Amino acid sequence: MGSTSTPDSSTNRLQDKVAIITGGAGGIGETTAKLFVRYGAKVVIADIADDHGQKVCNNIGSPDVISFVHCDVTKDEDVRNLVDTTIAKHGKLDIMFGNVGVLSTTPYSILEAGNEDFKRVMDINVYGAFLVAKHAARVMIPAKKGSIVFTASISSFTAGEGVSHVYTATKHAVLGLTTSLCTELGEYGIRVNCVSPYIVASPLLTDVFGVDSSRVEELAHQAANLKGTLLRAEDVADAVAYLAGDESKYVSGLNLVIDGGYTRTNPAFPTALKHGLA
């Protein structure tokens, strides 16, 4: 899986596929939409940011190739409409990329974390993923095929000080949902996987913390295990395209970790050792 900036001989790897991308009005979703269209897919992006979503579509391609549908993933009727609109327009659904996710906006400490904020993040990150999968499965089961991909996080199987408890809990839940759905839907030829990226300087982070993308990348690089390069939205999009397409036709239940080995290391140990020997 090379960078999307590198010429790829498999430019038609998603030819004639129909994909829905939730959270498609920016960040990883927008980048993935661009890549999917480049690879020959018909794409419907969904978001609550109508102006941004329509602008993304206008910038990428014509309405017959990419279109926008307003969708709040916490509302069953919105997700149902999203899938039904896609079927009406394109006749099928091959790929569902459940990419919506939000961060907590309250303090890290369990004593200070907001109750309503916890419910909000859980609702969007987990219930939203559930609804997206439910309505994708509704049309994929009769077709006996399909690929569902979720955006998880390295927080789906790790935890760290400063990363909110609710965000960590929701991403663990997304990984659990991936595994559980894989178990049920395999019978119908439907694959279910997720991607777990390290830090990406997306609007999700820059907007919440009020810093620009270069500062996020600087901090991410300082903490990273793999030096000399940065993880960008294009790299995550490459991973999603792999899981969405036929190249991964026998891959299901996978949590594809994109972290440069970060979660395979224990940065606290060498730091403590250095201080101890100083």
From Swiss-Prot:
Substrate binds at residues 104, 164. One of its GO terms (biological process) is lignan biosynthetic process. The keyword Chaperone does not apply. It catalyses: (-)-secoisolariciresinol + 2 NAD(+) = (-)-matairesinol + 2 NADH + 2 H(+). Disulfide bonds: none annotated. The active site is at 167 (proton donor/acceptor). Its EC number is 1.1.1.331. Keywords: NAD, Nucleotide-binding, Oxidoreductase. NAD(+) binds at residues 23-28, 47, 73, 99, 171, 200. Belongs to the short-chain dehydrogenases/reductases (SDR) family. This is Secoisolariciresinol dehydrogenase. It comes from Podophyllum peltatum (American mandrake).
